[in-house]
Amino acid sequence: MTKYALVGDVGGTNARLALCDIASGEISQAKTYSGLDYPSLEAVIRVYLEEHKVEVKDGCIAIACPITGDWVAMTNHTWAFSIAEMKKNLGFSHLEIINDFTAVSMAIPMLKKEHLIQFGGAEPVEGKPIAVYGAGTGLGVAHLVHVDKRWVSLPGEGGHVDFAPNSEEEAIILEILRAEIGHVSAERVLSGPGLVNLYRAIVKADNRLPENLKPKDITERALADSCTDCRRALSLFCVIMGRFGGNLALNLGTFGGVFIAGGIVPRFLEFFKASGFRAAFEDKGRFKEYVHDIPVYLIVHDNPGLLGSGAHLRQTLGHIL
């Protein structure tokens, strides 16, 4: 067996590749490529392997789209391929293609304390289920359970469940968005575009015309306290993040913890800490006490997708994480 395996984290814009030490799980030699510059994922992989002059026979790539069979067609990119054909073309012994939040969930057992910031709750209960979710371009969700010395990731499309308002303000938001877009999923309010939807709905609810703002604009104005509407939108985003996380905790009894990934929350960390997030997480009526001790963590590791891809592959190859 070779010392290293190839790991990757591929989104709509960029493909990030790295080497994983099969024995230790350590990630090294990470490099990001623009997906727009290459005709296929296989082409990017070949360039990476040629640049790093390393022999690799095993690989695991995390991709931001559902993985339901051999044929993979990326949701937000033109790349499409057969896993079996790519494995053959690259001369690999093993090639795993997994959902991006499967990778993030598999990273959790590998994380150290310095990679996490806790938001309330007690200590995690060893062996109990874990949930992970994260807002970015969309809303990713996965669960993780420990079975017979193996970690089993339970991926899905939980970001597309119905948005469930639990206040008068949230109900008005739902009514306005439903009139605009029809079905309103959680992702429609918990993502970069979702933050824009919240802002627009807040302004429209007051019979005013919203500005044409991007997520970055809303966040910057909210943090500068220069726009009341933006601050309300960001505050509501944090509250809905809490409600959604609490729902995940109830679904599977995630006493192993609820983990937040994705690139949005770290951009306004202090605002998030002071927000109504944790109160909303615990706002479960008769089951408030049930979720009270469930810890929530923000993942601040630079590359959980790469770390988790490596963990998934190593476990597939027989290593115990």
Swiss-Prot record:
Gene Ontology BP term (one): glycolytic process
Domain of life: Bacteria
UniProt keyword Cell membrane, yes or no: no
Binding positions for ATP per the UniProt entry: G8, D9, V10, G11, G12, T13
Keyword GTP-binding assigned: no
EC number: 2.7.1.2
Catalysed reaction, written as an equation: D-glucose + ATP = D-glucose 6-phosphate + ADP + H(+)
Function: Not highly important in E.coli as glucose is transported into the cell by the PTS system already as glucose 6-phosphate.
GO CC annotation terms, alphabetical: cytosol
UniProt keywords, alphabetically: ATP-binding, Cytoplasm, Glycolysis, Kinase, Nucleotide-binding, Transferase
Full protein name: Glucokinase
Compartments where found: Cytoplasm
Molecular function GO labels: ATP binding; D-glucose binding; glucokinase activity
Recorded family membership: Belongs to the bacterial glucokinase family.
Protein's gene: glk
